[in-house]
A protein has these predicted regions:
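Bacterial N-terminal signal peptides
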Residues: 11-20
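Short, solvent-exposed linear motifs at loop/edge-of-secondary-structure regions
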Residues: 7, 20, 321-324
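N-terminal secretory/targeting leader peptides
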Residues: 13, 26-134, 151-153, 157-355
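Bacterial Sec-dependent N-terminal signal peptides
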Residues: 1-10
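Secondary-structure junction/capping motif
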Residues: 5, 56-57, 141, 145
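Polar helix-capping/helix-linker motif
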Residues: 10, 140-141, 193
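Signature of the catalytic double-stranded beta-helix
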Residues: 137-151
Length: 355
């Protein structure tokens, strides 16, 4: 994460900062709980909004950690207030509030933020990476290029990353999804992202763009028969009550950048900027340790709930069909979309060679 750390510190007026991250298993207990930090003179509130209402979601885990670290590194001069469960609006609304400085921090899905910051669509290209290690490395290496672009496009600054896990098919059907043609008879919900919609069409599926907040009722009423999300979301939102199957594959991982209002950030002192950037860096390292442990728990719960789980062991047909759409969507990344996609591929190939 060294290159990411260097970039996140850009704009901190050369403040030297030690970014060594203590393993969460060995770290001292946090002296501050984000819900009740001690008051100090001139204390300012950092409003944090996100869309998930699960107490122990990876959203909650990383944002609590981030808020605690900001409080610690600013000596309680900046304290966080977390508003979960879309209390402040959906993700598009919260991104708008963040770019305006009304909200200081939010955690949108990359595919949702890409509506304002198209450069991030490079992460949405299907099968651009096929392992969590590749995704983490790509984030670390490509973020230096993306930070200034996203600031210009959306008015928000990436200070860290949360990965919720690989998107898996969840659905109600008599037979499992194993090959692309198995999607033909299923109405599947997709986020309103053009690349994700095109991926389903390439597989011969029937994508139905639908807001996340509408999904449970749509499944219950048969408007759609499934979709794809990490198992944490599927089980946390109790979709197992209205679906009976899940299929594991690796076409894209659900990622969420921690973004702060650039307007707010530029109004901070240099010490406070450095503290926010350090907190984002360390919260990223923390969630990368925490998330796989949590995800394994949710898969076990899905199995216990009676969900039939299938794993696609040979994804070559899925990969071939999905990657064929890439050239059509370089423009959705930007004028240099192809070059940015090639840079991402080169980063991953170099990473593979080093393993």
């Amino acid at each position: 994460m060294k290159r990411l750390a260097r970039t996140l510190l850009t704009g901190a007026a050369g403040v030297a900062l030690a970014l060594a991250v203590v393993s969460p298993a060995l770290a001292e207990p946090n002296p501050i709980d984000y819900t009740s930090p001690p008051e100090v003179d001139g204390q300012q509130v950092m409003k944090i909004g996100h869309s998930v209402n699960m107490e122990w979601s990876s959203h909650t885990a990383i944002l609590k950690r981030f808020a605690e670290l900001v409080a610690i590194y600013t000596r309680n001069e900046i304290v966080g207030e977390i508003y979960p469960g879309a209390q402040l609006g959906g993700e598009p609304e919260m991104v708008q509030q963040t770019r305006q400085g009304v909200l200081q921090v939010t955690l949108p899905a990359t595919n949702n933020l890409a509506a304002l910051a198209p450069s991030l669509n490079v992460f949405i290209l299907p099968y651009i990476a096929t392992s969590t290690a590749e995704v983490n490395h790509l984030q670390d290496e490509l973020t230096p290029t993306l930070v200034p672009r996203v600031i210009e496009e959306a008015g928000v600054r990436i200070v860290g990353w949360e990965n919720s896990g690989w998107r898996a098919f969840f659905y109600k059907a008599d037979e499992p999804i194993e090959r692309p043609e198995d999607l033909a008879d299923l109405k599947m919900r997709v986020p309103p992202n053009p690349i994700m919609i095109a991926s389903y069409k390439a597989w011969g599926g029937n994508p139905t763009p639908l807001a996340w907040s509408e999904l449970y009722n749509a499944l219950q009423q048969g408007v759609v028969e499934g979709g794809d999300n990490p198992v944490t979301d599927v089980m946390g939102m109790k979709f197992d009550e209205v679906i009976n199957r899940m299929t594991k594959f690796h076409y894209t991982i659900l990622t969420h950048p921690i973004v702060v209002s650039e307007r707010w950030f530029q109004g901070l002192s240099e010490d406070h900027k450095a503290a926010v950037l350090r907190a984002g860096e360390e919260a990223t390292a923390y969630i990368r340790w925490w998330q796989p442990i949590d995800e394994a728990k949710w898969w076990a719960q899905a199995e216990e709930a009676g969900v039939e789980i299938t794993e696609i062991t040979d994804e070559s047909e899925w990969i071939e069909k999905a990657r064929a759409i890439w050239p059509d969507y370089y423009k959705d990344i930007g004028d240099d979309g192809e070059a940015l996609a090639n840079e991402a591929l080169a980063i991953i190939e170099e990473f593979k060679r080093q393993q």
